[in-house]
From Swiss-Prot:
InterPro entries: Fe3_Rdtase_TM_dom, MsrQ-like. Binds 1 FMN per subunit. Binds 1 heme b (iron(II)-protoporphyrin IX) group per subunit. It is found in: Cell inner membrane. GO terms for molecular function: electron transfer activity; FMN binding; heme binding; metal ion binding; oxidoreductase activity, acting on diphenols and related substances as donors. HAMAP family: MsrQ. Part of the MsrPQ system that repairs oxidized periplasmic proteins containing methionine sulfoxide residues (Met-O), using respiratory chain electrons. Thus protects these proteins from oxidative-stress damage caused by reactive species of oxygen and chlorine generated by the host defense mechanisms. MsrPQ is essential for the maintenance of envelope integrity under bleach stress, rescuing a wide series of structurally unrelated periplasmic proteins from methionine oxidation, including the primary periplasmic chaperone SurA and the lipoprotein Pal. GO terms for cellular component: plasma membrane. Belongs to the MsrQ family. This is Protein-methionine-sulfoxide reductase heme-binding subunit MsrQ. It holds the Pfam family Ferric_reduct. The chain crosses the membrane at residues 8-28, 82-102, 116-136, 153-173. It comes from Escherichia fergusonii (strain ATCC 35469 / DSM 13698 / CCUG 18766 / IAM 14443 / JCM 21226 / LMG 7866 / NBRC 102419 / NCTC 12128 / CDC 0568-73). One of its GO terms (biological process) is protein repair.
Length: 199
């Protein structure tokens, strides 16, 4: 049975809750001692992982809609992408304000040079910024065929963001490897599209 437009609306409501509730949990954890002895790192990793989860969810929508024969699922893709950008922005902000501090923001450029994984992160965020800014139907009409060309850069983010995560952790752990593996799997599902580009 295919989803109806009304069911998709309720699904969007649920997805908005899924995007907002992690923020509620994080705020509670900060105020009630739910973080470790290094709360700044906890906040950075939590916001970054949440952004990655929404990135993977965004990439999942197209193959899921195709294989499950649920075309209306595509209507949730923009919503998930915007939540990905929102959490990526919180991730960047937590690094800039909590790690560097307001008085040391001038060091950000130097950090990008000395820590290449930060470069991957900021490139990913800039791409997400462009995609979020052009995600409306009006921008899609204005950009025409260039809109899809621009939004294909989400696949580059799907490569850079997991590498950024893997590179940023001090020790090898299963979680960043899992995210990288899921990203590769979701990209592999699009092999026909990539093969067409190479022709």
């Amino acid at each position: 049975m295919r989803l109806t437009a009304k069911q998709v609306i309720w699904l969007k409501v649920c997805l908005h809750l899924a995007g907002f509730l992690p923020f509620v949990w994080l705020a509670w954890a900060i105020n009630h001692g739910g973080l470790s002895a290094d709360p700044v790192k906890d906040i950075q990793h939590f916001t970054g992982r949440t952004a990655l989860k929404f990135l993977l969810a965004t990439l999942l929508i197209t193959p899921l809609a195709r294989y499950a024969k649920q075309p209306l699922l595509i209507r949730t893709r923009r919503l998930l992408g915007l939540w990905c950008f929102a959490w990526a922005t919180l991730h960047l902000t937590s690094y800039a304000l909590l790690e560097l501090g307001v008085n040391n923001l001038a060091l950000f450029g130097q950090e990008l040079i000395t820590r290449p994984y930060l470069t991957l992160g900021i490139v990913s965020w800039l791409i997400l910024l462009a995609l979020a800014f052009t995600s409306t139907q009006a921008m899609q009409r204005n950009l025409g065929k260039h809109w899809q060309q621009l939004h294909n850069f989400v696949y580059l983010v799907a490569i850079l963001a997991p590498i950024h995560y893997l590179w940023s952790v001090k020790i090898i752990s299963p979680q960043p490897i899992l995210y990288a593996g899921l990203a590769l799997l979701l990209l592999a599902l699009r092999y026909k599209k990539f093969r067409t580009w190479l022709k």
